């Protein structure tokens, strides 16, 4: 298992009643490996303030398998205006060190910098970003061909599978997103050793 395997994830939506107007939406999930709970994940979509909407994701993971130890506290913050990403920040605090990623709209392009565990990336993106990995946690990615990966600073390709199932692929990393009634209930992150399962908590 590698550190980016867990950092692939962001959040997932909970089943239940629609939020009241002006209320934040919160989704809580458990993260499992080999049937064992190893962490939690919480995604929040704040109530819109004018044209602005803020999304956040917090993941807290601890894995201890024999000689394999992993600790990750991971936070994503995305700010959208009129449906376009203006600023995305990622902070990861791990037993391998502290890491960060940032994508910021400069009026005619994004400055993108990702400095994560064994992953360093710089880019300029001129196309407005309107869909990110975090957005997948608040509804099916119907009609979306790709999602901006906040952690990596580039994109996952999205494709639809049978039923309300979607596949995300980037550089050999694969995940399956499963929806029920438009709500994301499970993510299966494929891993050569053990898959990571993220499940909606009751």
Protein language model features and the residues they cover:
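N-terminal mature ectodomain segment of secretory-pathway/periplasmic proteins
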Residues: 23-27, 31-105
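Hydrophobic h-region of N-terminal signal peptides that target proteins for export
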Residues: 9-16
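Sec-dependent signal peptide recognition
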Residues: 1-8
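Solvent-exposed helix/loop surface patches that form functional interfaces
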Residues: 22-24, 89-201
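Amphipathic/hydrophobic helical signal segments and adjacent flexible N-terminal regions
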Residues: 3, 17-18
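Short, aromatic- and cysteine-enriched interfacial helices/patches
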Residues: 3, 66-68, 137-138, 193
């Amino acid at each position: 298992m590698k550190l980016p395997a867990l950092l692939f994830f962001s959040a997932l939506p909970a089943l239940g009643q629609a939020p009241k107007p002006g209320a934040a939406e919160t989704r809580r999930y458990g993260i499992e490996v080999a049937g064992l709970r190893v962490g939690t994940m919480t995604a929040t979509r704040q109530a819109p303030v004018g044209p602005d909407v803020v999304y956040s994701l917090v993941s807290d993971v601890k894995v201890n398998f024999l000689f394999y130890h992993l600790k990750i506290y991971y936070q994503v913050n995305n700010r959208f205006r009129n449906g376009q990403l203006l600023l995305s920040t990622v902070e990861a605090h791990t037993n391998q060190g502290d890491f960060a990623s940032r994508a910021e709209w400069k009026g005619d392009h994004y400055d993108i910098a990702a400095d994560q565990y064994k992953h360093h990336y710089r880019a300029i993106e001129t196309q407005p970003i309107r869909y990110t990995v975090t957005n997948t946690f608040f509804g099916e990615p119907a009609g979306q061909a790709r999602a901006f990966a906040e952690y990596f600073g580039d994109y996952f390709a999205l494709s639809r599978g049978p039923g309300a199932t979607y596949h995300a692929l980037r550089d050999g990393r694969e995940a399956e997103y499963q929806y029920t009634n438009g709500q994301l209930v499970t993510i299966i992150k494929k891993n050569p050793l053990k898959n990571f399962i993220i499940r909606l908590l009751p």
